[in-house]
Amino acid sequence: MALWAGCAGVASSRQTVLTISSMSGSKNSSLRVAFQGEHGAFSEAAAIQLLGESITAVPRATFDSAFRAIAEGAAEALLAPVENSLAGSVVRVYDLLLESNLEIVAEIILPIEHHLIGCPGATLDGLQSVASHPMALAQCERFFLSHPRLKRVPAEDTAGSVRDVLASGNKSAAGIAGRQAATRYGGAILAESIQDNAENFTRFVLLLPVHREGAVDPLHSPIATSPAVTDLMRELPARLAERSQRPPSLKLSLALRLAHKPGALLAALEPFAHHGINLLKIESRPIHGTPWEYQFFLDVQTDAPTQLEAALNELRSATSFLRILGRYPPALDASA
């Protein structure tokens, strides 16, 4: 079952706010949304921006654990990053998505700003070490070149690095994370926006369980049937459409496998060109258990759902495997 059957509208990554009530039937509880990381992480900030302040954010240590959260009854939805404008795709998320019975129902693009955060009273001159996720450290290379005395300390999570610094009370240590981490843990921002590239954005997707054959048991989540899930599926398209600032459009993510022969990829892409479907992204990933053979992940976009269905019908005959990973309105470009 797909949430988006047609061009329902466009999600605004800056303006979309949706408050969801209980997923369990109680008016006093809120939608539980799993994410990878600690409280104060960019994923949590994206979930709150997309779904509203009333959600209950469920932090998990790893992507694997986050994907299991729904099956384990710890959450009803999952918010996961799939792509960064500088670092590229989050390949583990794509692998887990393909193994699961979760489907993309919405997306949001979040600007990524890295701040240097320390204990209250700490100063930049007094720092000796800076901790954060390796990707965040790498995206702040110019800052470290300007402050060569600072030791870089890899950490599991951006927000977690700030939490640990604040818990230690060590004024000679700091972490790199988003502003929300400083707010969450009471940290002081010692230097703002220290990332090398201001055009740094991460695309996050909201995932819900759907009926899907072939899902691996540990990731096969029960299909949510509570009133709040029904409300989410009913209200989200209209709310996103209300905030659209361009003609309604439909985005579709899919995975496919092809015969190992010349021209197979060209034959698979021709239906999109023939029907005027815009190919936004194509990326290959190894097929687990089949060395040197690959599957492809695609994102396409159109304002003509009928043409998209025609293209998909033609695509099925050109592929050995085809799975729709989600239909949803494209998020507005956060850099606009």
Residue ranges with predicted function:
Residues 2-336:
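Domain-level signature for soluble enzymes in the chorismate/prephenate branch of the shikimate pathway
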